[in-house]
Each structure stands twice: as structure tokens, then as C-alpha cells.
């Protein structure tokens, strides 16, 4: 409701077709939106200008509140979605780099609003849910990747010593 009142755009990422269909129906019932879904089954035809980026461009060109449902695998790389400033990872990828790449598409040149990223999570007091465990795993993978890509001073010195031997 808050996003609708602000007339902002939303990208929802999920790989699962059943969830895509469910969300599309829910958004139609709740907001009267005919939501576009782009996934591996999306028909694309370059000759008539129907490409995944073309479908996303059409979404971006509409004024006001709108939602698009995307598959991270189908559109995580190589397309820009900077008119949307709300990114919802409805289901999570096992690979944090894919998630980050998909999210980063909303931060491209032309984005003039603050970007909000959401990870809906089921929480239970009695036990650690799958979503909580997956979030911890993805955070750990991100930290490991950051450590390898941006080594601290000790690791840098150790690497230089190994290279100079």
C-alpha cells in the first residue's frame, strides 16, 4: 500500500513458476494490476522488438505504481531496470552473486530514487527457519567472496611473499 501511494515501481524476483503465477493473481486481485512476468518461458522475438529488455522497457515507461515479476536466471544479467526502486527477492538464490547482480540492475545510471531491497523471511521463535539459515549461508558466502576479492593487509603481504619466492 505504501509503495502504491508513492507511485513507485517494484521488481519481484522468484525462480518458481507456481509462485510467479500466485503473485500475479494476488497483485491483480489486490491492486488491479496486470503484472508482466519475465522468465525462461517468456516468448521473445527480436524481429518484432519483443526482447526481455523490451518487455522491461515497457514496464519502466508506464507511469505510476507498477510491478514486474522476474526470474533472476532469465534477467539477472544484461538488462537494466533502473526505474524501479523497490526490489523484492521473494525467493532466494543459492548464489549471492546472482542476487547481487539482479539487485544492482536497479542502481544503474538514471536511477533518481533511493533503492529499497527486501528479503521476505519466515521467523519462528522455536527454531531457526530455512529462510534464516539460508540468509546466514548467503551472508557467509558474501563475506568469503569479499575477503578473497578485497584481502586484508596480512593476506596481501602473505600473497606478495608467495609471489616473490
Which residues are covered by each model-predicted region?
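Hydrophobic residues at beta-strand termini and immediately following loops
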Residues: 38, 90, 120
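Residues at the starts of beta-strands that form the adenosine-phosphate
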Residues: 9, 34, 114-116
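A conserved SF2-helicase RecA2
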Residues: 94-165
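Conserved helicase ATPase core of P-loop NTP-dependent helicases/translocases
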Residues: 11-13, 21, 32-75
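Residues at alpha-helix caps and immediate loop-helix transition turns in enzyme cores, especially N-
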Residues: 15, 23, 48-51, 98-99, ...
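Conserved helicase/translocase motor-coupling segment
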Residues: 1-26
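Short, surface-exposed basic-aromatic patches at helix termini and helix-loop junctions that form
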Residues: 27-31
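SF2 helicase motor core recognition
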Residues: 20-24, 56, 62, 66-91, ...
Amino acid at each position: 500500500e505504501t509503495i502504491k501511494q508513492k507511485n513507485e515501481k517494484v521488481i519481484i524476483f522468484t525462480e518458481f513458476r507456481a509462485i510467479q503465477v500466485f503473485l500475479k493473481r494476488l497483485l491483480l486481485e489486490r491492486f488491479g494490476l496486470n503484472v508482466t512476468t519475465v522468465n525462461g518461458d517468456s516468448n521473445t522475438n527480436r524481429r518484432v522488438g519483443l526482447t526481455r529488455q523490451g518487455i522491461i522497457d515497457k514496464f519502466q515507461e508506464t507511469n505510476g505504481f507498477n510491478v514486474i515479476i522476474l526470474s533472476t536466471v532469465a534477467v539477472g544479467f544484461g538488462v537494466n531496470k533502473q526505474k524501479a526502486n523497490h526490489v523484492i527477492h521473494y525467493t532466494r538464490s543459492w548464489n549471492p552473486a546472482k542476487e547481487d547482480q539482479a539487485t544492482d540492475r536497479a542502481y544503474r545510471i538514471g536511477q533518481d530514487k533511493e533503492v529499497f531491497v527486501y528479503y521476505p523471511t519466515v521467523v519462528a521463535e522455536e527454531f531457526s527457519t530455512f529462510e534464516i539459515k539460508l540468509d546466514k549461508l548467503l551472508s557467509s558466502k558474501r563475506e568469503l567472496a569479499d575477503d578473497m576479492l578485497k584481502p586484508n593487509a596480512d593476506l596481501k603481504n602473505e600473497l606478495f611473499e608467495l609471489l616473490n619466492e
